A protein has these predicted regions:
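Transmembrane beta-barrel strands of outer-membrane/channel proteins
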Residues: 1, 52-56, 74, 95, ...
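Signature of Gram-negative outer-membrane beta-barrel scaffolds
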Residues: 1-48, 60, 71, 176
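Outer-membrane beta-barrel translocator domains and adjoining extracellular loop/strand segments
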Residues: 3-12, 34, 63-71, 76-78, ...
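Short sequence motifs at beta-strands and strand-loop junctions characteristic
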Residues: 26-33, 82-87, 116, 139-143, ...
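Residue-level signature of outer-membrane beta-barrel architecture
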Residues: 28, 32, 42-43, 56, ...
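Hydrophobic, lipid-facing positions within transmembrane beta-strands of outer-membrane proteins
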Residues: 34-40, 79, 89-93, 145-149, ...
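Membrane-embedded beta-barrel scaffold of Gram-negative outer-membrane proteins
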Residues: 43, 51-55, 59-61, 65, ...
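Gram-negative outer-membrane beta-barrel transporters
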Residues: 111-114, 131-222
Length: 237
C-alpha cells in the first residue's frame, strides 16, 4: 500500500485540534505495557485445594457499540493518541474438592476485575457517516465481579457437568447515563449450563445440553427529533 492516511487529533474537550498525515511504512503510534501474572495453589489434602491468581491484561483494540436508526452496530478502534489501551486487573480465588476417588469434581470460584480506559459512545452520539467519530467517544472505567459453581462427573457410563455463574459488568463513563454507573453490553448476570452424556455401548452414546443465559441489557428510546429532514432517536437512561 503506497497511499497516505490521515488522523484527527482530539483535545480533552473532544474537539479536533489538528490533522496528522502518515505515509506508507511510517509508524503511527507505539505503546508498551507489561502484563504480569501470578498463580498460587495450596493443597489442603488429597481431595481438596485452594487457588488464587492475579493477572493484568492489556487490550490494544477496543469496540464501542452504537445504534443508528434503531439498528445496533459495533465499531472497532485501535489505540491512538486519542484512545489509550484498555487495562484489566483481575483477582480470582477458588476452592476445589473431589469426591468418590476423584470421580466427582466440585469447585467454587470468585473473581473481581477492574478496568481502566474503557471507551463508549456518549449519549445521543452522532455516529452515522461521521468522519470525526473519535470525538463522539468517551473514556472511563469499569468493574466486573462474579461467582462460578461447578459439579462434574468424569467416571462411569453416565457423565456430565452442571455449572452456574452469576456475574456483573458495570461501567462509569462521563457523558453517559449522567455520569452514573450503568450496565455494559456484556452484563448478563445469570448463566446456567447442564451437559449430560450416557454411553450405551462403546460405539453408541447420547448427550443432552441445556443452556440458560440472561439477555443483554437494552435501552429503549423515549423520543425523537428531526433536523433538516433527518430523524434522530433520543435514548433513555
Amino acid at each position: 500500500y503506497s497511499g497516505k492516511e490521515y488522523f484527527y487529533v482530539v483535545d480533552e474537550n473532544h474537539n479536533v485540534t489538528d490533522t496528522l498525515h502518515y505515509g506508507a511504512g511510517q509508524i503511527f503510534h507505539t505503546e508498551i505495557h507489561p502484563e504480569p501474572r501470578l498463580a498460587l495453589m495450596y493443597r489442603i489434602d488429597e481431595k481438596s485445594s485452594v487457588k488464587a491468581s492475579y493477572s493484568r491484561t492489556v487490550q490494544y483494540a477496543q469496540v464501542a457499540s452504537a445504534a443508528t436508526g434503531g439498528l445496533p452496530f459495533d465499531v472497532w478502534f485501535p489505540i491512538s493518541p486519542n484512545i489509550k489501551p484498555q487495562t484489566c486487573d483481575q483477582f480470582a480465588a477458588g476452592y476445589f474438592r473431589n469426591f468418590k476417588d476423584n470421580a466427582i469434581e466440585t469447585s467454587v470460584e470468585v473473581y473481581y476485575k477492574n478496568f481502566k480506559n474503557v471507551i463508549d459512545f456518549k449519549d445521543n452520539a452522532m455516529t452515522y457517516g461521521n468522519v470525526l467519530i473519535d470525538g463522539e467517544l468517551r473514556c472511563g472505567k469499569g468493574r466486573s465481579y462474579g461467582v462460578e459453581l461447578l459439579v462434574r462427573k468424569n467416571v462411569g457410563k453416565f457423565t456430565g457437568w452442571i455449572s452456574y455463574t452469576y456475574s456483573r459488568t458495570l461501567r462509569t463513563v462521563p457523558d453517559i447515563n449522567f455520569g452514573k454507573e450503568y450496565r455494559s453490553p456484556y452484563d448478563r448476570p445469570h448463566n446456567f449450563v447442564i451437559v449430560l452424556n450416557y454411553d450405551f455401548t462403546p460405539r453408541l452414546s447420547a448427550a443432552v445440553n441445556w443452556i440458560y443465559n440472561t439477555g443483554q441489557p437494552v435501552t429503549f428510546p423515549y423520543g425523537q427529533y428531526t433536523i433538516d429532514g433527518v430523524t434522530y432517536v433520543v435514548q433513555g437512561s
